[in-house]
Swiss-Prot record:
Protein name, UniProt field: Protein TraE
UniProt keyword annotation of Iron-sulfur present: no
Pfam families in the record: TraE
S-S bonds: none
Function summary: Involved in F pilus assembly.
Species of provenance: Escherichia coli
Xref: InterPro entries: Pilus_assembly_TraE (IPR007973)
Gene this chain is encoded by: traE
Alphabetically ordered keywords of this record: Conjugation, Plasmid
Homology family: Belongs to the TraE family.
Cleavable signal peptide: none
Lineage, opening ranks: Bacteria, Pseudomonadati, Pseudomonadota, Gammaproteobacteria, Enterobacterales
Keyword Protein biosynthesis (UniProt): no
Length: 188
């Protein structure tokens, strides 16, 4: 009888140990799954927004944005740099500099200061009218084609066809303008 009770106790203890081990493994796996889900909710949750003045909603997350958002930001950056006059150029360029990474601001400040100096000295007014926009959201690349009209003093406007490429990056909830370049389309 004593031998049977001891065997039964060992069997119950073994079953309890196996049951507790299974519970621990399940608990650990549920905690890992919860951790992954919490990370995704924190960093990849998209918020849909329809800004004032636009009729197209866009979605942004902590580290990414959709094509509509990138297009709207690129058009805003184009307006800040190209839709200027001798009175508004400083404020527009200062607003644009807020979206340039701090490490690259000095280089861009020099470029914008040269542009502002020419605009003020020659009493230039300019306006950019986009004709087409292409967006590659996976690369943060936006290509904008359009017509830049430039008035020097009281003269008739000069018209140039322009093609700009903007590279936008979204990191930790902040949108950065990594590149604002102009390309020359080859005449065919």
């Amino acid at each position: 009888m004593e031998h049977g009770a001891r065997l039964s106790t060992s069997r119950v203890m073994a079953i309890a140990f196996i049951f507790m081990s299974v519970l621990i493994v399940l608990s650990l796996s549920v905690n890992v799954i919860q951790g992954v889900n919490n990370y995704r909710l924190q960093n990849e949750q998209r918020t849909a927004v329809t800004p004032m003045g636009f009729n197209v909603p866009f979605a942004v997350s902590q580290n990414s944005a959709d094509a509509s958002y990138l297009q709207q930001m690129a058009l805003s950056f184009i307006a800040l740099r190209l839709n200027v006059s001798s009175e508004t150029v400083d404020a527009s360029h200062q607003a644009l500099l807020q979206y340039i990474r701090p490490g690259a601001q000095n280089q861009m400040k020099v470029i914008l200061a040269e542009e502002a100096k020419r605009i003020k000295n020659d009493n230039v007014n300019s306006a950019f009218f986009q004709t087409s926009v292409r967006v590659w959201p996976q690369y943060g690349r936006v290509e904008i084609h359009g017509v830049l009209k430039t008035w020097i003093g009281d003269s008739k406007p000069f018209t140039d066809i322009k093609h700009y490429i903007l590279i936008l990056k979204r990191e930790n909830g902040v949108t950065w303008l990594d590149n604002f370049g102009e390309t020359d389309d080859e005449k065919k």
